[in-house]
Amino acid sequence: MLRYKAIVEYDGTNFVGWQRQQNGLSIQQLLEDKISTFTKQTVNLIAAGRTDAGVHALGQVVHFDLIAPNNSKDLACINKETDNKEVSKQNNTTTTIDSLKKMLPCRYNAYKLMSAVNYLLKPHRIILTSCEITTLQFHARFSAKARHYKYRIINRTVPSVIEQNRTWWIKPPLNVIDMIDASQHLIGKHDFTSFRSSACQAKSPLKTLTKIEVDTTNYPEIQIYFSAPSFLHHMVRNIVGTLVYIGLCKISPAAIKTILFAKNRAMAGPTAPSSGLYFVKVDY
């Protein structure tokens, strides 16, 4: 068995989300179908995060397994080692992990697999930006130490034609200072019940938010960055919706603590549109 780790970039606009569904085309379904077409094997993709319909990704991480060719006698070395270390030396020829990977048949070579799948994905707005053989111990979801998201807002009197379906347009001017002040009360380990969706299946509402940063460097675009080991369903979008209400003076900045401690979704702001959300990267 060979395990592959890939990084995926996609525009989520025309998809029903990451996960396979019966009511439309998902990113998982399309990727699995194209990988299977090239490798002639059925594959099951495991993702670091299951993004909703309309959510984009710059660095979604996935893993999948392929049944290796029977003559891969050095397969155990590939599966156990991630570094390009020396594994054997015969007749003055040194064999390394990287050289073993390059000797794999075409459909098992990570770079050739990536190139072929990217070709098959056209014209869909999905692309593999990297692909490598990793250890069998790697798990895209459970090995993750931190996940990073960003949310993009356009704050001006007219919407952006170019950024349609990629941002949330807010016409009235936002009080960004109040948004920044309020956001800092959410950093740390808290019960985020007030910011989780009713459909959230997480066993516990306790999450540790390590970063919220409101960036106005490119105003009228506002980018809000989030980092945490994991998130609740709709947690980022519900926080953004609440911060926007604070920026519009519909909620006072001081009320953010009351909302957090109330553990009541009805007290927080609306769920921000999926179009402005990006899954940026995963730390392992």
Curated annotation (Swiss-Prot):
The top EC class is isomerase
Q: Which GO terms describe its biological process?
A: tRNA pseudouridine synthesis
The reactions it catalyses are: uridine(38/39/40) in tRNA = pseudouridine(38/39/40) in tRNA
What SUPFAM superfamilies does the record tag this protein with?
Pseudouridine synthase
Q: Does the keyword Ligase apply?
A: no
- Record: residues binding substrate: Y149
Question: Which cysteines are disulphide-bonded?
Answer: none
Q: What is its EC number?
A: 5.4.99.12
Q: What is this protein called?
A: tRNA pseudouridine synthase A
State the organism of origin. Orientia tsutsugamushi (strain Boryong)
